[in-house]
Amino acid sequence: MLGIWTLLPLVLTSVVRLLSKCVNAQVTDINSKGFELRKIVTTIETRNLEGLHHEGQFCRNPCPPGERKARDCTVNEDEPDCVPCQEGKEYTDKGHFSSKCRRCRLCDEGHGLEVEINCTRTQNTKCRCKPNFFCNSAVCEHCDPCTKCKHGIIEECTLTSNTKCKEEDSRSDLLWLCLLLLLIPPIVYVVIKKACRKHRKENQGPHESTTLNPETAINLSDVDLSKYITTIAGGMTLSQVRDFVRKNGVSEAKIDEIKNDNVQDTAEQKVQLLRNWYQLHEKKDACDTLIKGLKTAGLCTLAEKIHAVILKDITSDTENSNFGNEVQNLV
């Protein structure tokens, strides 16, 4: 009897250990199943985020780079109907569900930019600074001209940094100061004389400043400016274009809309703003309004350039027309 009471604690200890192992095994199995379930749910959620997009119906996959969605999916998890973007004008650089491609960037020569890599269906245009221009910001919307050194160069101008110039010594500074003091009076005289001459020419009026006949003057007021819009935009800054169209009837809402449609492309913003102004103004007297607006903004050189180009085109068209009439008369 005493032997039984001695063995009883050992038996109870073994039973407790066995029950503990069973419980731990069940808990481990439950945790393992819970982990697998969470893994499946995570996989499904990831698939939903990466491969599905709700727009009408669930499309299984996005359109690849260089293409856009032609129409919405009609059946859940159907393959989308994708069509290529317009080569050289539009692109998409990653998979997406949009029905539109992005417009290619334009490198604005007026801001010192040129094309480094042309736009393709899968890659936007890459711009760089023109020779003798630089840009030291992360995103370049315009490049600045390199400084020209008068007294020697320490570091040459690069695409990302301006020229570093040597400084002039104090004796040279004193010499230049004396020369400058001697030159100031004649320079002031010449400037004043030119300003007075220019003022007199401007007050002469259009009939005295041009030799065009009345027929040509009438045609100038009705000239079609649409083919000159790009040239005009290239000679103006974005702020100058906005100020001009704002003063000539384009609403702030339209200006903001064009800005938002072309956030990264200032050259396209200028072109679209001028085209919108021209559509609102129509052809009648648009040329005169433009020339006066450019002169008011201090862009007299650009105004004269555009005026000369238009007159040249009109003269050429008139000569061709007269030649054709003479040929018909001879026949």
UniProtKB/Swiss-Prot annotation:
SMART domains: DEATH, TNFR. It is a single-pass type I membrane protein. Palmitoylated. Palmitoylation by ZDHHC7 prevents the lysosomal degradation of FAS regulating its expression at the plasma membrane. Pfam families: Death (PF00531), TNFR_c6 (PF00020). TNFR-Cys repeats lie at residues 47-83, 84-127, 128-166. Residues 226-250 are annotated as: Interaction with CALM. This is Tumor necrosis factor receptor superfamily member 6. It comes from Cercocebus atys. The lineage of its organism: Eukaryota, Metazoa, Chordata, Craniata, Vertebrata.
